[in-house]
């Protein structure tokens, strides 16, 4: 079986420090912002949780604050925990407190999950409503569609991977990784708490123009090595993109990748 990574011209860049990775992520994001704002007047960005938000802090530096057209950004989440939006486990809260509240992106351009579903812990309804939200924005031409498939195509997704090789809330051994019809699905038995989550499906993730997967620390090294050794039991091994899928790794995360890969 040919590697998905080979098919998509996936790249990996290994950075000596997290600081250098963060700086490179900021530059990469800012360059794509300039490209898409000029070409189409919008920049659709998909966030994940975890350490990613702290690495985005480089975009708070004056050179980016002053040059980025923040009013043209539209923010989404590749996955979300179905908890109240002010809960400590909320990816929305993490992103808002650490990044979104510090940049002038219009609040109307930020798309968290439905607050009532979040408060009630209703994962199924939260997934359905988020999918409806995406479809409305496709109809308004804020989100593009991928070629003939009709799936939404985001400009940039900033992703992370767990030590078990999960990305978004697509976990090894769970059926959600095989979902191909829906844009957004849900899980109520996540192996990582909290158990209720919604997540983009794999086709939506892989339709993005640019996917940047940022992974740091030795705890992730085994999973990173398996991904680059084409172990498709790991959801992250299926990552691709329309234009570019790129992995930003620190030295610890990359330490077990077989030579030549």
UniProtKB/Swiss-Prot annotation:
It comes from the Eukaryota. GO terms for cellular component: cytosol; vesicle. Pfam families: Glucosamine_iso. Keywords: Cytoplasm, Hydrolase. Signal peptide: none annotated. It is found in: Cytoplasm, Cytosol. SUPFAM superfamilies: NagB/RpiA/CoA transferase-like. GO terms for biological process: carbohydrate metabolic process; pentose-phosphate shunt. It catalyses: 6-phospho-D-glucono-1,5-lactone + H2O = 6-phospho-D-gluconate + H(+). CDD domains: 6PGL. Its EC number is 3.1.1.31. Pathway: Carbohydrate degradation; pentose phosphate pathway; D-ribulose 5-phosphate from D-glucose 6-phosphate (oxidative stage): step 2/3. One of its GO terms (molecular function) is 6-phosphogluconolactonase activity. Belongs to the glucosamine/galactosamine-6-phosphate isomerase family. 6-phosphogluconolactonase subfamily. Catalyzes the hydrolysis of 6-phosphogluconolactone to 6-phosphogluconate. This is Probable 6-phosphogluconolactonase 4. It comes from Arabidopsis thaliana. The gene is PGL4.
